[in-house]
Amino acid sequence: FCYCRSLSGFCGKIIEYSENGEQGGQAPLQKRLRKERYTMAESMQGLKRTHRCGELSAANVGETVTIMGWVQKNRNKGGLVFVDVRDRSGIVQVVCEEGKTDAPLLEKAASLRSEYVVAFVGTVAKRSGAVNDKITTGEIEIIPSELRILSSALTPPFQVEENSKTKEEVRLKYRYLDLRRPDLQRNLMMKSQVMTLTRQFFAEEGFIEIETPMLGKTTPEGARDYLVPSRVHPGSFYGLPQSPQLYKQLLMCSGFDRYIQIARCFRDEDLRADRQPEFTQIDMELSFVDVDDVIDVNERYLAKLFKEVLDVDVQLPIQRMTWQEAMDRFGSDKPDLRFGMELTDVTDVVRGCGFGVFTGAIENGGSVRGINAKGQGGMPRKKIDKLTAFVKDYGAKGLAYIAIQEDGTVKSSFAKFMGEEEMADLVSAMKGEPGDLLLFAADQNKVVWDSLGALRVELAKQLELLDKNEYRFVWITEFPQFEWSEEQGRYLAMHHPFTMPMEEDLPLLEKGELGKVRAKAYDIVLNGNEIGGGSVRIHMDDIQEKMFEALGFTKEQARSQFGFLLEAFKYGVPPHAGLAYGLDRLVMLMAKQDSIRDVIAFPKIKDASCLMTEAPTPADEKQLEELGLEVKAQPEKAE
């Protein structure tokens, strides 16, 4: 049979062969097909896909169907060819058998290789062999009557399969292949479902979806903006939005009452495991509301979202916890509540003891706190030393410990500095029992919180205490209004300059006691991850002026950066509040992934570059000239 190409496919013309299978000096057909691998593409003219691969079931037995997709696997058993065809819905098996399948089709099917794009027309039949319970189409197979190779493929640099062990750098370079993997496709389809449900829910709640500008005014406060040079205004730049914050507040001034947007945002900052230079927010703002109103609508949203997407019931109301309580109990403002191991403040217990590390920290205004790792009293010293090195990354000078043996005796790094009664009181305060390991940090509160909070999570990972099938939400409220910057030597806004202080703390703002002022701010935390945050906004001129003054803004500076917003506030501004979710992080947790890169189609790596497109790249000289820009050579970084 001849396989020369035409618009309708291979012509199938019969060619005479000699006994040894050769014709015109050519190798036998089977050998030529194996060598050429059908690199010619055929048209799909006249064909229409009737079903996706994973949609077929026993209910379709006897039907003639047309499927299209990628070859996942081809198994040639010599006269019996099994082809697994894959699309985003799943996999279905096509069976070609000598004597039952036309010889040209059998030969053609035998030549297929992984990732060829194919179209099969055939009849759905019950499987002649064992049922495959691993796939949804495991009861059936397709007996083909027609095959077209729509596109051939080179051998891919890695196998397209679930939970690939290929290095991430390779997968990101060939992201278009990586995205064919079923697990990544499920992630992105879940993300699409989340966005659809989000729009539906908030539309039913009376929210209006409004787009805000991508090209806005750059502001020097906070994270660095991505700058976009203006060709028509030489020397001037737009800033890509870090959030739609100012615009959504203006929309409240405009009377839109309830705003929602799935917004693209940009931040030019050093990347961490849960950060990307461009990301997506579910952004909202509401007028004539307070904290409870924002929390109420968002609890109902989360309950609906998790029920619809994951069939998980979210218990309402969601637990609330003040920032101070979260820090004292968990050493973190985004606590993971799936396990215990809470911090215990033993400052008063060890005050005046003989251990200088403890008493020195207390005398310097710090605290002593500990965690009880239940059942870990037998942990080897080398492992404890590794934990000590771990907390040093968070500013701690060391880690003191008490290992309670099964017989009740203790091994401790500081027992010789304390009396028996002091040690017994400390163990009692920590609720220590035989077999427990007690770990302590002594320093300024922030260092103790940060180090023990991180240690708590690290131990939970090592001890496998984290259940990915459990979803524990908590609202964190009453954040500090300001945080001290050692680098800048001044107070900065913990959230942004437009966050409303707690009414009862306004006198503290007046007196300049900024470290004591609490904000009407709130975060929603899931399994130790902040998935959203927001606040009630300032809508009163006098309080806004005091905020700017506290942050070190002159009136001229405030007007230069935020003049358009302040001007709008002069024409009547309603009390308003809002919240924004990090969509990527939310979906990451729902999909039980470890990185937001696995829920973003084309993510960047840690240096904010794209391995696939090689962005960013130098601009063309002509482009720079049009923009009135000149690039200065940067000094090479030291090795």
Where are these predicted regions, by residue range?
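Cysteine-centered motifs
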Residues: C2-C4, C11
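Serine residues within intrinsically disordered or low-complexity segments
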Residues: S6-S8, S18
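Short, Lys/Arg-enriched N-terminal segments with co-localized hydrophobic residues
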Residues: K13-T39
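Class II aminoacyl-tRNA synthetase catalytic cores and aaRS-like
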Residues: K35-E639
